[in-house]
Amino acid sequence: MTQAFQKVSAIRGMNDVLPGPSAQWERFEEIVRAWLQGYGYRNVRTPILEQTRLFTRGIGEVTDIVEKEMYTFTDALNGESLTMRPEMTAGVVRAAIEHNMLYERPHRVYSIGPVFRHERPQRGRYRQFHQIDVEALGFAGPDIDAELIVMLGRLWNTLGLADIRLELNSLGQPAERAAHRAALIEYLEKHVDILDEDGKRRLYTNPLRVLDTKNPALQEMANAAPRLFDFLGEASRAHFDGVCQRLDDAGIGYSLNPRLVRGLDYYNLTVFEWVTDRLGSQGTVCGGGRYDGLIELLGGKPAPAVGFAIGVERLLDLWEQSAGQQTPPECEVYVVHQGEGAQRLAARVGEDLRDAGLSVIVHAGAASFKSQFKRADASGARVAVILGDDEVATKTASVKYLRADAAGEGAQDKVALATLASVLKSKG
């Protein structure tokens, strides 16, 4: 006797997106692509798998992502260490270097797709999640930093989102961070007895991240620590002032957060996050900043760059809360039929209506009119096209309007098949 196969479930933290929610995703992505194209950004697509050394070099060996969160394995064919991308920026920069994109001119590019981190799943934090990654490669001034932030403000408005606030900081340049790092280590050494395990681990490897602690017991100590902003030179301050002035000009509100450092080592100068209190502990909807050294660090010709990433699942959650999401209909027209001749005619009518640009579902199989109408209503279609023996004989169709916005809910007309498409289009 064959043993019953135990059904397979999705991996914890890696979620299926079923037809209803998937329609929301498609609508959301249409809005996002139109928004990005409105600012001149063009799509790039990079592989999910990259060489591990791209991320250890680009993100930083002592970051949480590299130390604890990457899905890494050895390729059995050549022994190469490969990693499923935990973020997109490093891969986009690798592609720009490999294909000599920056030798001719700067580029505005974006990617949308899945990324992977080995984390403990919870609301807003998954092992496979999706990002909108936006990069301005080859741009140096504070104007582009501000434009990216203003762009995001426009997206929130388009989606009807409120309660998202902007936090800003400057990480300065490497020499300024080195001076601050020395002062910070000296300060933290005086408080080593109260540091938690994460703090002690990061004390000499990544002391800035100690200040980003979520441990309430360390907040007072972190608040009194030396501030990086006090170590910034004239050029770094001028760049940050330029960003703030342009945000003021655009009417974008913000707060300065001296402890905002981001979780990736490649940032310098401007860093920012858009955060909300409406998603529980996972309140960061979008984060980004400037990374002028990353292109050179990964083997390219030195070039400035700035970008951001949006967490799609978190933003969709926020959008749903704001009632911005309405389930799109499965089709505009649902064709119901009774009898073999009507079923065959329905297939031809469906194709004719699609030729006219309408989305159409032709009921599959045999069923009563009652059950077909029930299915038509559930589909969200605005009209039902009804075909029976009489319609076949007279080359007509009965049209029943199912929605209040479709020429009168419940009304029914008789329409010649030759003019059916134009009638439905005119009443759309």
Curated annotation (Swiss-Prot):
Its main location: cytoplasm. It is found in: Cytoplasm. GO terms for molecular function: ATP binding; histidine-tRNA ligase activity. One of its GO terms (biological process) is histidyl-tRNA aminoacylation. It catalyses: tRNA(His) + L-histidine + ATP = L-histidyl-tRNA(His) + AMP + diphosphate + H(+). InterPro entries: aa-tRNA-synth_II, aa-tRNA-synth_II/BPL/LPL, Anticodon-bd, Anticodon-bd_dom_sf, His-tRNA-ligase, HisRS-like_core, HisRS/HisZ, HisRS_anticodon. It comes from the Bacteria. GO terms for cellular component: cytoplasm. Belongs to the class-II aminoacyl-tRNA synthetase family. Homodimer. This is Histidine--tRNA ligase. It comes from Bordetella avium (strain 197N). The gene is hisS.
